[in-house]
Amino acid sequence: MAHKKAGGSSRNGRDSAGRRLGIKKYGGESVIAGNIIARQRGNKWWPGEGVGEGKDHTIYAVADGHVSFKKGFKGRTFISVLPAAEAAE
């Protein structure tokens, strides 16, 4: 005879790995063309000047310069890359 009653298996205990989303380069940081500035799901941040947006909404630099964050209309935050000479002013 069994000395313990059969225990059911739990349906919990699984979790997916984090997706490593968020800002990768902060305001004022230097970037070169192709650097990823932000990874996101949907548009938490919007692309401004000097940046491109990938099909997964990743924002990346298309020119060398410094990262800039600006608040825009409807409360949107725009990420831009300013050329190095312009960012120094």
Curated annotation (Swiss-Prot):
InterPro entries: Ribosomal_bL27 (IPR001684), Ribosomal_bL27_CS (IPR018261). Transmembrane segments: none annotated. The keyword Ribosomal protein applies. One of its GO terms (cellular component) is cytosolic large ribosomal subunit. Keywords: Ribonucleoprotein, Ribosomal protein. GO terms for biological process: translation. The keyword S-adenosyl-L-methionine does not apply. It holds the Pfam family Ribosomal_L27. One of its GO terms (molecular function) is structural constituent of ribosome. Residues 1-20 are annotated as: Disordered. HAMAP family: Ribosomal_bL27 (MF_00539). This is Large ribosomal subunit protein bL27. The gene is rpmA.
